[in-house]
Amino acid sequence: MGLMDTRWETIVPFIVMALMEACTIALTILAKTALTGGMSPFVFIVYTNALGSLLLLPYSFYFHRDESDDEPFLTKPSLVRIFLLGFTGVFLFQNMAFLGLSYSSPIVVCAMGLQSPAFSFLLSLALGKEGGLGWASKRTKGRVIGTLICFTGAFVEVIYLGPFIRPSPPSSPTSNFLTTISHYLTFFKNSDNWALGSLLLACATLSISIWNIIQLDTVQKYPQVMKVVSAYSLAGTLQCAIFSAFMEPDLSAWELKLNMDLYLIIATGIFGSIIRTSVQVKCSKMKGPYYVPLFKPFGILWASIFGTSFFVNSLHYGSVLGAAIAGTGYLLIMWSQVQKDDPNETVEKNDNHQLDSDEQTTPLLLANGDFDQV
C-alpha cells in the first residue's frame, strides 16, 4: 500500500497540473474568441475579477478555518501592500495581458508568460537582492544563460511567423468541420497586430515580476495565503472598475446577455479564483515550491495541440519555435534555481545572506502568478 500511495502521490498531482494548463489554454482561446467577437477587454476583466473576488472572500476564510490568525491583517502597512499587489498583479497585468491577447494569439501568451523568471532575475539584480551572487557558480551561469535564451525565444516570437503548420486543406469532411469551428472559435486572425500584442504581453510579464517581489515579503508577514489573495483581488477589481469606466463609457458594452460571453465570464471567474488557486496551493504544499512552475511550458504543448487539431491558418511554425525556445530558457532557469552551489567554489557571502527572490517561491506566487490568469 505504501508504494501504491507513493505512486498516486506522484501521478495524481502531475495529471491534475497538466489538466490545469489545458483548461487555462482552453479559456484563453475562448477569451480570444470573445474579444475578437467585439467584447470589450475592460468589461471582461471587471466582470471576471468581480465574480472571482466575491467567491474568494468567503472561501478564503473557509480555507484557513483551522488556522490561528496571529498577525493583524488590516493594518496600514498591509493595506499598502494589498493595494500594490492589486495594482501590479491585477490592474496592470490583466489589462495589458488581455489587450495583448486581443492583438495576438494564445501561443504568444505562452511565450511571453515564460519570460517571468528572466524578468524576476533582472529585477533582483537591479534592486540589489542578489547579495553574495557568485558569478562563477553553475547556478548563476544557468540563470544568465536561461535568461538570454528566454529573451531569444521572445525575439523569435515577434519577428518570425513562418508558414502555417496546418494550412487550409482541399474541400473534405475534415476541412468542412474545421471551417465550421472557425466560425465559433478564434485562435488567430490575419488582422492581428502581432508586434503590439507581444509588447503588451511582455509588459504584463514585467508587471507580474514586480508583483512577485512585493508578494514575497507579504506572505512572510501574513502566511494565510488565500486571505491575501482575496484582499488584493478585491483591491485590483476596484482599480479595474474605475479605469474601465473611463475606457468603456458606453453602457451598452456593459450589458450581459445569456450567451457564450456570460458563460465564459462565469467559467473564468470560478476557475481562476477557486479551482486553479486551490489546486496550485495544494500541489505546492505536497510537492514543494518548484513543482507548480515546472508545468508552465505545458501551455506550449496544449496551445500547439489545440491550434493544430481544431484550427487552420492559425498556428505558425515560427510562433511555436519561439515559444519552445522560451520554454527551454525557462526550464534552464528553474533547473538553476534548485541547484546547490559547489562547496569548492569560494564565493564571498554575507553572514546574513538571504535566499534570492526566485528561491523564496511561496504558494501565493504559485496561486496567482504569470499568465495563469489569462
Swiss-Prot record:
Disulfide bonds: none annotated. Keywords: Membrane, Transmembrane, Transmembrane helix. GO terms for cellular component: membrane. The keyword Nucleotide-binding does not apply. Residues 26-155 form the EamA domain. Coiled coil: none annotated. The chain crosses the membrane at residues 11-31, 42-62, 82-102, 107-127, 145-165, 194-214, 228-248, 255-275, 292-312, 315-335. One of its GO terms (molecular function) is transmembrane transporter activity. It is a multi-pass membrane protein. It holds the Pfam family EamA. It is found in: Membrane. Belongs to the drug/metabolite transporter (DMT) superfamily. Plant drug/metabolite exporter (P-DME) (TC 2.A.7.4) family. PANTHER family: WAT1-RELATED PROTEIN. This is WAT1-related protein At1g60050.
